[in-house]
Amino acid sequence: MLAMNDLKFFYENSPEFMGFIPRKRGIDSPKTIIYGVLNSGKSAVLKNEISELKKDEILYLNLADLRLEEAVANDAIFAARNSAGDTKASEINEHEISREATLDAEISDTGQFYRAAVKNDTKIIKNASLNYINNAKNAESGGIKNRSENFFREIKEFLAANEQISSLFLDNFSSADFEISSLQSFAGGLNLKRFIISTRDKELVLPGFERLELLPLSFEEFIAFDKRHNEINSMISAFLAQGGGAKNPFIAPAEILEFEQSLLTANFSRTEILILKECLSFVHAAFSANKIYTALKPRIKISKDAVYGTIAKLERENFIRFLSKVGEPARAKKLYFSHFNMREILTSKKDFSKKFANVLFCELLGLNTSIFYTKELDFYLPALKMGVLIIPFSDADIIFLKFRKILSALKRLDVTSLKVVSMANSGRLEIEGIRCDVLPFHEFALSF
């Protein structure tokens, strides 16, 4: 059981954090859940809140901290987590490596995943993720719910005994280690000025809490973070090479690949990484989980359940995203990675067109509006009446010919602004109230 002395240690040794670089999105509510993919900067945003408070007013707990794991070892909250015979994994949060093993358990709800396979319906995969996680938890030894309740009860008693603490920060919360229902009960019974939680779980919701999705660095944010380049072309090259990981600008370029690979091996099993590699084939293309299963089956022992469960996990933890065709939610969705440099991390092969499309998708996510694809458009943002085409190397005159060909489709979609993203070309043409702007990447990325 977590002892008072253990909590006292963490209370007296809160993290020191300086030099925070503001992000486009920040905390606006005293009760906030920060969620996002690995290496998106969640811990940094959370710790920046701490830096503005008096030390005796805060309790900060990194739930992936090895020292905290030792403190709760008797309750075995972190025990019995395996990754299908792989060695224990360790979590790397935004500023340090801390253990968080992955779980690769058999899934009992085969029927639901099989129906998803037949229909190739990523919506069903998403709905099945809850069953995947719940069944994985059932494979663990002991009652995680009781251990979670004991853990949060100890924190509550410590807060009651130290009334000067008005702010609680829980970093790296994982539903693989703690019951969400226990966290909900715990949060509902507290009277704090601030309660901030960070997690990779996009489905974590608590009554009275605002939710802040933190994305990897946009190009604009990368420029603010990276101080090694001062010319726009070198900035673009560095961004495309290093990716949008929040810690990457502070790592020597030669060490970024090793760091990124360490993130993966620390948080995913060998089987999950193989599934990730297969996902690369579907970037900016119609996704099929069944094709991934078919590709892997001759090479490794794997079930459809494991494939669909892993896809559900990757989506829930914001590692992959799916893009629907407008007006046709049942159609196959396109896949994108939250970290657009995943191909270089996982393979020696390059595909600039797919990577560039993924880069632009990540930039558009920052607009916080619905995105779709259509037959004519790579990306369609109906709320902004905007369409986006990716044509990196064609001259403006050739692009304008395509603009004329799809003009009727743009009218039907009520698009008034067509953005054509290029690597270097530029130009503008307006026809019948619809404006086509050919923009170099940096102008497009910095225009929002």
Enumerate the language-model features and the residues they cover.
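Walker A/P-loop nucleotide-binding motif
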Residues: 30-45
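Conserved P-loop NTPase "ATPase switch" module shared by AAA+ and STAND
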Residues: 158-179
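A cross-kingdom feature that marks ATP-driven nucleic-acid transaction machinery
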Residues: 2-6, 38, 326, 333-448
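Accessory nucleic acid-recognition modules appended to NTPase machines
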Residues: 259-382
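N-terminal pre-Walker A segment at the start of P-loop NTPase domains
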Residues: 1-25
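Short glycine-rich substrate-engagement loop in P-loop NTPases that contacts/grips substrate
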Residues: 61-81, 118-121, 125-159
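Interdomain motor-coupling "hinge/lid" segment immediately C-terminal to the ATP-binding subdomain
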Residues: 199-285
